[in-house]
């Protein structure tokens, strides 16, 4: 099931930075390649787990992303734990998060939406389908009118 809320549409014009929280280097390269193939040339920072993601977001020297792409299955702090942390932080809770995962578990999907994610996308196995998945994210993002407050 591919689900993205309208909230993702609100970030394109003023916050064009993406944070990818993903521990699998092949998936990182696939995300980078698919965004490039789609003409999305916004800065993309990558960290490998939820703890590193929190550290990145809380470091004032780093740019605030307009969108977080989040894997669920990671070491140290998984995606659901990361979501719980940022949704309690007034400075971070309004950043749209799209879960990009291989998990087809209904419990993971529900736990993600319980923590107010903007979207939940399954990582396709083949590259053309992956590009189509990233295109959905890009299309929602590119139709935005204003950034979240």
Language model features by range: what are they?
Residues 15-36, 68:
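Conserved acidic segment of CheY-like receiver
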Residues 32-33, 46-67, 131:
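Acidic, metal-coordinating helix/loop segments flanking the phosphotransfer/catalytic sites
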Residues 125-138, 145-146:
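C-terminal output helix
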